[in-house]
Amino acid sequence: NTRQQVKSDPELNVTAHTPPHSTSHLSQDNAADIKYDLIVLGAVSQTAKKKAQDSFMGMQYAIDSGNRNALMTAVKQTTTQIHGLNQKYDAVTLKSAEVTAARERLKEENNLQIEMGNIILSDSPDRQRFAELSNKHDNAQKMVEIEMEALRIKANTAS
């Protein structure tokens, strides 16, 4: 059975497009599970946010200085960190369908950053495509923030 092979191969969980866990066991509309999930996902996110900010500062410095080699290095480091973050997100066992869906959107947002980095690394960067992805990323980021805030509000109803 192909499905069993996919589940047993942990290497397939590396890409952000492959949900690593079955959703059949997830709770729906359970404030306590949402609260738990937000805590464990938040723990993964906090460390990564600091690293991402540092990487972004490195990219900004490289852009401002016009140093193409420094920019390439910064983009590659950022891409590696984003892949690592997506893997860490996948490694977290969540209990609620709502936070599981939010995690997938976080990974999609991260993948937009990777695509933007790939454009920067290309020999002839497509500025229009980069601008489109940047807008899409900004919108995705806002939507995830709204969704996470709604989940935090729901989680606060848990006793």
Which residues does each PLM region occupy?
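N-terminal propeptides/low-complexity segments immediately following signal peptides
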Residues: Q5-V6
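C-terminal amphipathic alpha-helix
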Residues: D9-V75, R105-S159
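Sec-dependent N-terminal signal peptides of Gram-positive bacterial secreted proteins and lipoproteins
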Residues: N1-T2
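Mature extracytoplasmic domains of secretory-pathway proteins
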Residues: M72-E109
